[in-house]
């Protein structure tokens, strides 16, 4: 009789859960874990196509959403993930704009646009969206366009955006999120296996990244019934005991 028991070699390495926990705490990925979207080589090399195609796809919605905000003279605005600066022309010149992005190549393009347009009210700098190097309540308005589904930790990024926004300030997001329609959601989940290698996610749930933030929802809508994009405009609550978004709806 052949035994069904297979003995493991004494030299076989066993997985140590303590090691896994330490690796997770220090950001060490296992061999099977895919790199974060923004670290994708394809993502870094797609800048020419980004500048050619992306304006046709998204610029109109971004510009309209910025121009829908009441922006007072002297207000401080932070754009997280400014990229090559395709959104910068939509901001009024009477405000002070700071743009941050991880890609220094994209920021070089943004600086070219700033110099060519002689914009003295705009400054861009390299920075991680998940670790914004600004004090709490530094800005009156914080914006981000099609970035939250690109970063490693979307919830962390949104938390940082809320932190640097002053109480009573506004947060504006344009992004695609997982559809509430089950059929479309399944398609997006399948597509995510491919899009992650191109630098973005299609399975990100809106509630997962904003429901615990101290924000009051002002507007949440799609530009058209068939649009893949969602536009969110919210106000930072000042009272730490105030209801969260999920409770304020």
Q: Where are the language model's segments positioned?
A:
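Conserved class I S-adenosyl-L-methionine
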Residues: 7, 13-72, 86-87, 109, ...
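C-terminal alpha-helical "lid/dimerization" subdomain adjacent to the S-adenosyl-L-methionine
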Residues: 34-37, 49, 54-56, 172-230
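Class I SAM-dependent methyltransferase SAM/SAH-binding core
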Residues: 78, 82-131
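A short SAM/SAH-binding and catalytic strip from SAM-dependent methyltransferases
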Residues: 141-153
